[in-house]
Amino acid sequence: MEYFKNVPKVQYEGPKSNNPYAFKFYNPDEIIDGKPLKEHLRFAVAYWHTFTGTGTDPFGASTMQRPWDRFSDPMDIAKARVEAAFEFFEKLDVPFFCFHDRDIAPEGDNLRETNKNLGTIVAMIKDYLKTSKAKVLWGTANLFSHPRYVHGAATSCNADVFAYAAAQVKKALEITKELGGQNYVFWGGREGYETLLNTDTELELDNLARFLHMAVEYAKEIGFEGQLLIEPKPKEPTKHQYDFDAAHVYAFLKKYGLDKYFKLNIEVNHATLAGHEFQHELRYARINNILGSIDANMRDMLLGWDTDQFPTDIRMTTLAMYEVIKMGGFDKGGLNFDAKVRRASFEPEDLFIAHIAGMDAFAKGFKVAYRLVKDGVFDKFIEERYKSYKEGIGAEIVSGRANFKTLEEYALNNPKIENKSGKQELLESILNQYLFTE
């Protein structure tokens, strides 16, 4: 069965094309810095938003028109989604996809039945992977949707829930390895608290660390060679989540001796919910060598929640790819579109249009960022701005030879301090020049 009959294979046609099913800026085989653009960007489709999203919200029922919804049996729907997914990957020519365990197979009446369902669908996906160009960027376990996780998973007050979550992650690690996944993600949507009045914060954080250490050990035991990732988010669905932002996660990893095993999967919306620009989170992760992968989307800044819109802001994508290029590019990570079409964009064709828009936005952003890095636009200014640390008292500070006494003596004998302009407006103007010209 063909699920997307109205959509041809998506091709690159250039910026003057009016074809909604064509790339305008993303030419996957375009060589930049000795490597095809598709290898720089490593795009991935999010299985959950694309194939299981219904369009429901707190005020209304589902709106999405999906051809696989004609089935009633959950396993029949799951099988149809696999067929539709690989047709989608092929037509979009996307190299990767990501999934939660509960995205690909329905939960059964008990853990054994659930794992049996997973086994059936994983076998089906494996067959498709034999002939498909698409690969698994990362897998993960859904430890937030089922009512058992009302108090959390690894941080639950109920040890039975901790045990169930461990069993679920064990299976998710196994199937991610079986499907050739290059990463495994932990996102603690329920790992946090609503009120401190009933929370043993120390025990919860200690238990979260114990859980992650167990995961590390099991990944080693089964020979999983992918990168383990943690995805920060400050809130939603939980009022206060322990993986608040990149700095919080890094401090947690350092405290519990986990920093050598984990990197971060940074999402745009999660950064802004934490009160940061996306580039801030990427920069912090990059300079601490913990930037692993990206969940690409965009937030409506007039709304107070995680809107998961497809990214179309070229300035944002440019500054994001600037950090990725400065890092040396992705290793095992990539750009996963953790984004959903709007509730009113309910036709199956909208899934392609949305992904094309996001892929074009990041392709354009990458090209602009590459020119910025190559020309040293910001590097030259920053080097000049901090040149006082290259010689004299600045060099003494950086080398560790200075102390409070020597610095006081210097300050007493150097009463005149001269600062220079930060030139923010000039730099923003230069950025605009690069954005609006080839």
Curated annotation (Swiss-Prot):
<feature type="binding site">
    <location>
        <position position="270"/>
    </location>
    <ligand>
        <name>Mg(2+) 2</name>
    </ligand>
</feature>
<feature type="binding site">
    <location>
        <position position="267"/>
    </location>
    <ligand>
        <name>Mg(2+) 2</name>
    </ligand>
</feature>
<feature type="binding site">
    <location>
        <position position="231"/>
    </location>
    <ligand>
        <name>Mg(2+) 1</name>
    </ligand>
</feature>
<dbReference type="Pfam" id="PF01261">
    <property type="entry name" value="AP_endonuc_2"/>
</dbReference>
<feature type="active site">
    <location>
        <position position="100"/>
    </location>
</feature>
<dbReference type="GO" id="GO:0009045">
    <property type="term" value="F:xylose isomerase activity"/>
</dbReference>
<feature type="active site">
    <location>
        <position position="103"/>
    </location>
</feature>
<dbReference type="GO" id="GO:0042732">
    <property type="term" value="P:D-xylose metabolic process"/>
</dbReference>
<keyword id="KW-0413">Isomerase</keyword>
<feature type="binding site">
    <location>
        <position position="306"/>
    </location>
    <ligand>
        <name>Mg(2+) 2</name>
    </ligand>
</feature>
<keyword id="KW-0460">Magnesium</keyword>
<dbReference type="GO" id="GO:0000287">
    <property type="term" value="F:magnesium ion binding"/>
</dbReference>
<dbReference type="InterPro" id="IPR013022">
    <property type="entry name" value="Xyl_isomerase-like_TIM-brl"/>
</dbReference>
<keyword id="KW-0859">Xylose metabolism</keyword>
<keyword id="KW-0479">Metal-binding</keyword>
<comment type="similarity">
    <text>Belongs to the xylose isomerase family.</text>
</comment>
<keyword id="KW-0119">Carbohydrate metabolism</keyword>
<keyword id="KW-0963">Cytoplasm</keyword>
<dbReference type="InterPro" id="IPR036237">
    <property type="entry name" value="Xyl_isomerase-like_sf"/>
</dbReference>
<feature type="binding site">
    <location>
        <position position="338"/>
    </location>
    <ligand>
        <name>Mg(2+) 1</name>
    </ligand>
</feature>
<dbReference type="InterPro" id="IPR001998">
    <property type="entry name" value="Xylose_isomerase"/>
</dbReference>
<comment type="subunit">
    <text>Homotetramer.</text>
</comment>
<dbReference type="GO" id="GO:0005737">
    <property type="term" value="C:cytoplasm"/>
</dbReference>
<dbReference type="InterPro" id="IPR013452">
    <property type="entry name" value="Xylose_isom_bac"/>
</dbReference>
<feature type="binding site">
    <location>
        <position position="267"/>
    </location>
    <ligand>
        <name>Mg(2+) 1</name>
    </ligand>
</feature>
<protein>
    <recommendedName>
        <fullName>Xylose isomerase</fullName>
        <ecNumber>5.3.1.5</ecNumber>
    </recommendedName>
</protein>
<feature type="binding site">
    <location>
        <position position="308"/>
    </location>
    <ligand>
        <name>Mg(2+) 2</name>
    </ligand>
</feature>
<feature type="binding site">
    <location>
        <position position="295"/>
    </location>
    <ligand>
        <name>Mg(2+) 1</name>
    </ligand>
</feature>
